[in-house]
Amino acid sequence: IQEGRWRERIERGVLALLTYVEEETDGFIILAHGQLPGQGRTYSTILNRVTAEVSHLLAEAFKHRGLDEAMAGLYGQALVGTVSNSALWWLDERVPDKHTVAAHISNLCWNGLRGMEAQPRIYAGEAEKEA
């Protein structure tokens, strides 16, 4: 995910995780649902490394687009959480196929990032405040 256009990076990252789920199902189950005796929280460690890398890439993109780089860690957590939780769901479902799931997850991530506001705020409840 180090090179290429931003959307392609997202797609490759999502496909990589789903391919791991598909090809190393037992390993993913161990990582996602527990750990081997005597070992630490392996899945958490892997996700933390992935999140750090994604956050670093997002900081670059945010700087390029004039967004707050300090928030890249939050968005990295959100993106990795979206992808990893969807992978857990797909582990049990396996329908739709991997490429369809990856396309939909990438669509959500890409279009959500593409339309980001520089100063987001909560709109829910504003009508109640005005009343």
Predicted segments, located by residue:
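Secondary-structure edge/capping motif, primarily at the C-terminal ends of alpha-helices
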Residues: 1, 28-35, 61-62, 86, ...
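Amphipathic alpha-helical linker/stalk segments
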Residues: 1-13, 28-32, 54
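Short, charged, surface-exposed loops that flank catalytic or proteolytic processing sites
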Residues: 5, 96-101
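Amphipathic alpha-helical packing segments from all-alpha helical-bundle domains
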Residues: 11-15, 19-20, 38-63, 73-88, ...
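Short, hydrophobic secondary-structure boundary micro-motifs
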Residues: 28-32, 40, 120-122
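Short, charged helix-capping/linker segments at alpha-helix termini
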Residues: 66-70
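C-terminal effector-binding regulatory domain of bacterial HTH transcription factors
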Residues: 116-131
